[in-house]
A protein has these predicted regions:
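A broad, low-specificity signal marking well-ordered, structured residues that form hydrophobic/aromatic
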Residues: 23, 74, 100
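Positively charged, low-complexity intrinsically disordered regions
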Residues: 6, 38-39, 62
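Short, Lys/Arg-enriched N-terminal segments with co-localized hydrophobic residues
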Residues: 1-16
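Short, surface-exposed binding/anchoring microloops in extracellular/periplasmic proteins
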Residues: 17-45
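Acidic, aromatic-enriched beta-alpha/helix-loop junctions
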Residues: 43-92
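A generic structural signal for short, non-catalytic loop/turn and secondary-structure boundary residues
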Residues: 2, 18, 69, 84-86, ...
């Protein structure tokens, strides 16, 4: 497999597969589901190798924050009707009142928000 301008070229298949990011968040677990702030405790993450998502692991929220601060990129992903993951949005850190939240969009809310990912 070769990398060329952000794409992976599969020598055997001769097709281009776009790499979304370094890591993909596919599910979330909230600290307290009754808390309206919705703070994530941990996430299920897979590596994006350009052809598929691999190596599913559970990571603590603080590890995701540290990775993003160290320039490791994340996006969300959702399963379609065929059970295949589709790329969601880029995950960012949004600091509100001095607290770092992981979100897909900046806003003034004191909560994590990765849209409507599967919960575990």
């Amino acid at each position: 497999m070769y990398v060329k301008r952000g794409f992976y070229f599969n020598i055997l298949g001769g097709s281009f597969m776009e790499k979304w990011t370094d890591k993909v968040i596919v599910a979330v677990h909230y600290e307290d589901t009754n808390d309206p702030r919705r703070v994530i405790e941990k996430v299920k993450v897979e590596d994006d190798d350009g052809d598929s998502l691999k190596n599913k692991v559970v990571m603590l929220r603080k590890s995701v924050v540290a990775d993003i601060e160290n320039n490791i990129s994340y996006v969300t992903a959702y399963k379609d009707d065929d059970g295949k993951y589709k790329e969601g949005k880029k995950v960012i850190i949004d600091i509100v009142n001095g607290v770092k939240y992981i979100k897909t969009e900046k806003n003034d809310k004191t909560e994590d928000n990765l849209d409507k990912l599967e919960e575990f």
